[in-house]
Amino acid sequence: EYNGYKVYWEDGAQFTPPHDKGVTEEVMAITDLSTVKTMGAQEAKAKGLYEIIGAAIDDKYIAQVKAQVVNQGAIDRMQDQITIVYTPLHGTGNIPARRVMKELGFTHVYVVPQQELPDGDFPTVSYPNPEAAEAFALGLKLAEEKNADLVLATDPDADRLGVYVKDSKTGEYHSLTGNMSGCLIGDYVIGQRKALYGLPEDGAFIRSIVSTNMADAIAKYYGIQLVEVLTGFKFIGQKILEFENTGKGTYLFGICLLYTSPSPRDSTSS
């Protein structure tokens, strides 16, 4: 069944105005499908217009995600003291998420076995959404068995991340909203960068119009500008590209996008 598609621009983010308008106009101008030029897969491959993403691209992606780590030393010191439970919720996040955690040095990572492999029927959940508490039922059960500190869940197409953290005093697990985790990651990334390298005078923290105003307070605390954009990671990507093209502004963080690449929303990098 056709389920739509996403179109990305050369910066790696989904395209934004005016490019979206141009594509829409071209599509709407078609009055007879028989006039549309087509090309078979073999011809497209021969002309370098068709490429199946494989291991080489996977490796580049993983390398980019790992490059976003701001303090590997902190991970090295704590990797044996942190226990993580992870579930891909029958989706696509299993291999990349586990690979990144392993290569960064996290040794105590447990995957929910019932939800490890891809399954479009999602037999263990009625709604495979990491923002829903029900999706964490098996993950939290395993977390209690393993005395885990952190429970992570990615949605089926691995572009959203759900988080539960353990209260060290009570032993209870509490969920973090996207605004909570975004601010925690943002404060950590910017704070670490300040401590290690200092912050640029034109540093910017980006949030969408629906994200928490706590981001404003974080930006004020670090003395950097707060930039507000429309809802959607593509608009964060658009602002990043604007910074790069104009030389006015240095991207530090966006809720919740760590660095300039990869630009789409992505649970593995988070």
What are the roles of these predicted feature ranges?
Residues 1, 92-94, 118-121, 158-162, ...:
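Flexible loop/turn segments at secondary-structure boundaries
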Residues 2-9, 159-178:
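Short Gly/Thr/Asp-enriched flexible loops that form oxyanion-binding sites at enzyme active sites
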Residues 86, 102, 139-154, 162-166:
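Accessory "access/gating" subregions that flank catalytic or transport cores
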Residues 3-135, 142-143:
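Gly/Ser/Thr-enriched, mixed-charge loops and adjacent short helices
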Residues 26-53, 167-254:
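Proline/glycine-rich low-complexity loops and linkers
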